[in-house]
Curated annotation (Swiss-Prot):
Name the UniProt record assigns to this protein: Photosystem I P700 chlorophyll a apoprotein A1
Organism whose genome encodes this protein: Zygnema circumcarinatum
One of the record's GO cellular component terms: chloroplast thylakoid membrane
Record's keyword terms, sorted: 4Fe-4S, Chlorophyll, Chloroplast, Chromophore, Electron transport, Iron, Iron-sulfur, Magnesium, Membrane, Metal-binding, Oxidoreductase, Photosynthesis, Photosystem I, Plastid, Thylakoid, Transmembrane, Transmembrane helix, Transport
Primary localization class, coarse: plastid
Location(s), subcellular: Plastid, Chloroplast thylakoid membrane
Binding positions for chlorophyll a' per the UniProt entry: H674
Amino acid sequence: MTIRSPEPEVKILVDIDPVPTSFERWAKPGHFARSLAKGPSTTTWIWDLHADAHDFDSHTSDLEEISRKVFSAHFGQLAVIFIWLSGMYFHGARFSNYEAWLSDPTHIKPSAQVVWPIVGQEILNGDVGGGFQGIQITSGFFQIWRAAGVTSELQLYATAIGGLVMATLMLIAGWFHYHKAAPKLAWFQDVESMLNHHLAGLLGLGSLSWAGHQIHVSLPINQLLDAGVDPKEIPLPHEFLLNRDLLAQLYPSFSKGLTPFFSLNWSEYSDFLTFRGGLNPVTGGLWLTDTAHHHLAIAVLFIVAGHMYRTNWGIGHSLREILEAHKGPFTGEGHKGLYEILTTSWHAQLAINLATLGSLTIIVAHHMYSMPPYPYLATDYGTQLSLFTHHMWIGGFCVVGAGAHAAIFLVRDYDPTTQYNNLLDRVLRHRDAIISHLNWVCIFLGFHSFGLYIHNDTMSALGRPQDMFSDTAIQLQPVFAQWIQNTHAAAPGFTAPNAAAATSLTWGGSDLVAVGGKVAMMPIPLGTADFLVHHIHAFTIHVTVLILLKGVLFSRSSRLIPDKANLGFRFPCDGPGRGGTCQVSAWDHVFLGLFWMYNAISVVIFHFSWKMQSDVWGSVTAKGVSHITGGNFAQSATTINGWLRDFLWAQASQVIQSYGSSLSAYGLVFLGAHFIWAFSLMFLFSGRGYWQELIESIVWAHNKLKVAPAIQPRALSIIQGRAVGVAHYLLGGIATTWAFFLARIIAVG
């Protein structure tokens, strides 16, 4: 008898035409909720509409329908991203000096925005060099285009049109997969298939296609650009693709074709797949041959990873088996039950993804300056500062979002009866120990980090510098960080004998890469000032985590409110007659967590901005390196007064004195954003009753004049007021910082 593997069963994974397409719904705001569909009777309606429009859980309890809406919305999100990208590329094609910058990136500044002189604001068009008048941009697009091998504005036009085509496709896909062929719930829950496709397809083939583009297009074009060839003389991408001899002139191993690949002599390809380390001295960026090698390696890893999970063929890993086998001697049932959670609660899934993505985004921020990936990025200080700040803020918001969705999962999706003695249950049962220990850590870090600063300010004020904690008095050197730096700096000759240079110049040594007389990257020394600020970082991060984690762990119940789960994710208080129960909802913890996230990230970007200007960025002359602020960080950052005087006040002079110059828009934004920030306090420090009384008085006046509105005005609810408050607080604070940073660094960098 013959034994055959079982036939893979054919599953029907879509429903055809589940929801009719109708434009009439567009004319009925709030059609998704019975209470909202009636239309507005009070002004609260518009706030509830915004709060619930994307809260698909509140529209229906059918998980399949929720999943389809989320899936469809993702295509809409991608369409918006493609339209935005297309706009960036169009600006590069139509309003930029990209071709001029490409021919002289060390003297000409990037600009892709030209202000039209409608009411005399053409003063904003500064001279960026090469006879071009425009606003200096700090997005890094020019550098990424150069790294990708873009040599003309026509290519940017073509890509901009391609972006619009892709956006159209995404919008059609979003409609198609909700109205025409909507996936069944089983398709959304098929985690093994999803892992295989996302790992091998998205990450694996995505990296492979980028590696292919780098090898066949970017490397030859950048090699010629680095050698000083005029961009107009460089062959077009398709010529490199179609004519192997052109490539072989630059990378001789191309003449051998695929023979070395199939004969396993892969080292033959080492002319374009390198392992150099360090930075290209011409551009100040990573060697593009290193990054091509890196993406090829990543592609191989992820394509292999995308074949690990069991689908129709009965071989490979099963996620459920992995999770249920994951038990330790002290962890009860281990991860049993988590599979069900992660396949039925998209909030739980989203919380993990946001926490991971947020952490990765912050890691990206730190690599963008220490290992600058694109040509001429490292010497464009405005772009370096912008990219670091941007990725830090994004990471902070993602991490707070993780706390929000973890709490929503516990309130809406968690079923305690199915989770007995697994890790989640055990964490929830000893939450008091977790939170009280974390609270102790926060108190310790807060008093000690702040205490060191208060000591220094007091000694400085009393004229006793010899009794301060500083590099020139009582030293508190960050010895562990210095040990890590030295280990990495010594690696090339020691633990990594094949590496020509350390992974980053920041680790130490004597190397300095300068491009056009500007420092690209050099060793970053750490001292007492960094030790002090580091502990402020530790403090603010731990407090943010304390607030978010307390919100998550006590989202279903607490000693104060044992039935909290019944009150939902957001509620103002536990009903009338129970004093002292306001601001305890999971939503309120997210609200408070946002302020501490803002604190934490602000200290990080201030530290980065000042440290780089003091110890890294600057010009190289015959006498040595002249840093922008002359190395004043080590002495001044050891007191709070030093931060206020030598960082905030000293460096705000550019934005405050920007009127009458091309930077004046930053002066206006600095003022306006301060106003938005202050406006937020009106919402955060006021009571609802105060506004309701005022509104009723104003309505009385309208009634007197017979102009009373049909929709009855209402004061914002407590939670709506706090949401408006925190939104303006963050918007005002971030925009103020943005104007302060850019006016400063564009003026001096």
